[in-house]
Amino acid sequence: CSSDLALEYIYGRVNEFGGLCTIQSETRVSPKHLVGRDDLDGTCDVQLHVPGVLEIIDFKDGMNPVSAEGNPQLELYALGVLSSFELPVNGTYPFHTVRMTIVQPKLALRNMEPVVWCEISLEQMMAKIGRFASAAHATDDPEAPLVPGEDQCKYCPAKGSCSALAQQAVESVGMMFPVVQ
């Protein structure tokens, strides 16, 4: 069962820290208090809070490898979790490291590593706030160009009605066939 690998990984991490951790699963998170937007929320599969480390674990069921490094979905989940903390008077988080992990069991069928992760410092994570805020606010501009592409359109709910994607498809098909005279 695919979920067995995910559970084994989580249990392994819990044992690594002698059980001194908190696990939360299927949690709705939003970075709104840090990014200034309330439309960037999502469901974090698993949060693991261990001494000094916040780990975001995302389960993927596909065969296409997903990288943990530089993964905006995981970064937004991490910012969402951090946004949910009520900071003490000294304003520090209980974490100094953010670990972002992808568990993708089906990759083992392709002899690929099914668990990948990356770690960054809390400061590096917090430095990403401005980039996310700027990118999100840029989408509010009614003149913002639609920029179709394989990565950004893959799971977009507007894919079927996007005029820019349709135009790109027409142009691509036009290049494949010679002009008939």
Q: What is each residue range found by the language model?
A:
Residues 113-121:
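Short beta-alpha connecting loops at secondary-structure transitions
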Residues 123-181:
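Accessory terminal regions of nucleic-acid processing enzymes
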Residues 59-60:
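Activation of the activation-loop gatekeeper triad in protein kinase-fold domains
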Residues 50, 65-102:
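Metal-dependent nuclease catalytic cores in nucleic-acid-processing enzymes
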Residues 41, 72-76, 127:
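A general alpha-helical scaffold signature found inside nucleotide-binding enzyme cores
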Residues 1-54, 97-99, 111:
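Metal-dependent nuclease catalytic cores that hydrolyze phosphodiester bonds in DNA/RNA
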Residues 103-114:
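Short, conserved secondary-structure transition motifs
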Residues 81, 108, 120-124:
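Internal, well-ordered alpha/beta segment that forms a basic, Gly-enriched binding/recognition surface
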